[in-house]
Amino acid sequence: MSVNVPLHKWRSADPAILIGRRCIAQTDQDVIIDGRLELIRHPDGAASLRFQGIGNDIIAHDPNTCSNSMSAGIRSLAIYGKE
């Protein structure tokens, strides 16, 4: 039996280590999305994480502060370890 433990320090984590992790997000419209994260790098050095196969960004990475934040439209989220 495996137990999923949330990754509490996702706000300061390097976005590359979040690739493939399970994420459960709740949108502002109370829609629950459950899936794996993929990394998208932007030309300006910023990055974002989104669910594999879904085009909406879930997490935005700011390279100036080396921090992550929830993207617009996301109310809450939990990130879990790789299974």
Predicted regions and their residues:
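Intrinsic disorder/low-complexity segments
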Residues: 14-17, 26, 48, 61, ...
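Mixed-charge, Lys/Arg-rich low-complexity intrinsically disordered regions
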Residues: 1-17
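Short coil-to-beta-strand transition motifs
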Residues: 26-34, 70-73
